[in-house]
Amino acid sequence: MKRKILATLLTVVMATSLLAGCGSKADAPAASGSGDAAASGEVQEITWMFWDDLNATEDLISKGYADVIDRFNAEYEGQYHVTPITTNLEEYYPKLNALVASGDVPDVFIVSPGPNLTDYVEPGVAAPLDDYLADGWKDTFTSDAVFSQQTYDGKIYAVPLNIAAACCFYNTEMFEAAGAKVPTNWSEMLDACEKLQAAGYTPITISAGTAWCLSMVAGYLCESKGVDLAAIADGSGTWEDGKLEAAATDLVELSKYFQETAAGDTNDVATANFYNEEAAILIQGSWAIGQINGENPDFESKCGVFQFPGVERVIAKSDSLAMSSTTECPEACIALMKMFTDDTAQKYTAEVGGKIPVTKVEYDANVAPAQLAYVMDVFSGAKGTFGFYNESMPSTEAGAHFDDDMVAVYLGDMTPAEAASDMEAFYAENCR
């Protein structure tokens, strides 16, 4: 298996492990510096990297994270101080990898479970957290199961912040006006889109410019066809058994109901099309509730949710925090991570942000966004969960290859059969 990014990271981390750490407040904020701050009584500086602009965002989850940063700096004034490093989602991992390569590993950074986290665990960039969780912190979480995707060889390398599910948002008023019913299977999905289009509405808004958005839909379609990722990875299965080809064919069929600008639209633009009532359906996830309600609070009353039709399981994921293995301020980092999972932050997660908390915190469902209750209904009716397809493959490179192939199929640059053949060739060379 070729893991070029892992080899690069491992080389860099081994060469620069002594450079990372925290600095005193007199120093310029950075992820590296002297460990003398704790002994001298100076303020310990740490950094936290995140995939949104905390100053400009209207996303309610991001606003909640900004509140955590403010609370942390106020509560630990004179002891610890955290400086955020922010960027947009599309540029997040390239910029994080650049910091790793330069030796300036952020002390704490957000990461998605799966191959993305693996890329920081295997080279030793992320630190195991078990010793810190053992002080009673772990007992505040709902169960050990919330750490399943963050655990490697029995050790936990990241802490989940929330749980979200991929789902379909829909404009209830548009559905009613078009005489469309909420679909429960694939034929009903196509029928609803046909009625919406006939009524003059754009049925679906989606981003192919942000490739994972389109590949998430492809992942659901693969699930509906019975694609077995584990068997394909170990060589007992193949991408060329007809299942991916059938899923990609359905993707092409569904794409005739996408907005005309889907090929170039980013995730943010596609989501805005929905809450600005320019399209009837947004295939996204409950992580978008904070963005939808933050940008257009009046839209909440007409925003319904249904499970992607034709599948029994739902895609679930969590935002997670990892700590640099070379930080010289682990106590400050853990204090920050604990604040992200304290009762104040977790209540906000549900009552304002519309995501599912990962701790045993009690929250008022009556004040939470209406969409959260709909998402909980989807969860309760599902027979299980699975991960994003591009985050469930042997490597980030394999996931990116799947993303690119699905976009190519949508654009007409590759047939479904060619995509299946291309994925099989990639796995044969890189993953087995």
Show which residues each predicted segment covers.
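Conserved N-terminal structural module of periplasmic/extracytoplasmic solute-binding proteins
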Residues: 7, 23-118, 122, 182, ...
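Extracytoplasmic/periplasmic substrate-recognition and gating elements
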Residues: 44, 71-78, 177-178, 249, ...
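Hinge/lid segment of periplasmic solute-binding proteins
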Residues: 88, 112-167, 181, 190, ...
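A structural signal for short loop-to-beta-strand junctions that line the ligand-binding cleft
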Residues: 99, 106-107, 138-173, 202-205, ...
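Extracytoplasmic/periplasmic solute-binding protein
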Residues: 153, 157-161, 166, 190-236, ...
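Conserved C-terminal helix/tail region of periplasmic/extracytoplasmic solute-binding proteins
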Residues: 176, 256, 380-432
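Glycine-centered hinge/linker elements that transmit conformational signals in sensory
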Residues: 193-196, 234-263
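Long, aromatic- and glycine/proline-rich binding clefts that accommodate carbohydrate-like moieties
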Residues: 303-306, 350-401, 408
